[in-house]
Amino acid sequence: MLTIELNEDGDVVEIHGDTHGLASLRDIIERLLESPEQIDHAHLMTPAWGGNELSEDVQRESNSLVHHVKLHFWGGA
């Protein structure tokens, strides 16, 4: 499970994950780091948005679910 939410005020991003979900996020980040010449970004989406990387199960009732996250790799140190 990997769920990304915005708090009630919309100024804090919360990442909720179990072992599998956080390991999947780590793997996506590692792919970006290992192949920057081939991959400079990655999409994480809920099933409602055509993906399977993010869960649609809100973990805090007052939060808003994020359906699409785009990770960008800009290289460098």
Identify what each model region corresponds to.
Residues 1-77:
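Positively charged, low-complexity terminal tracts
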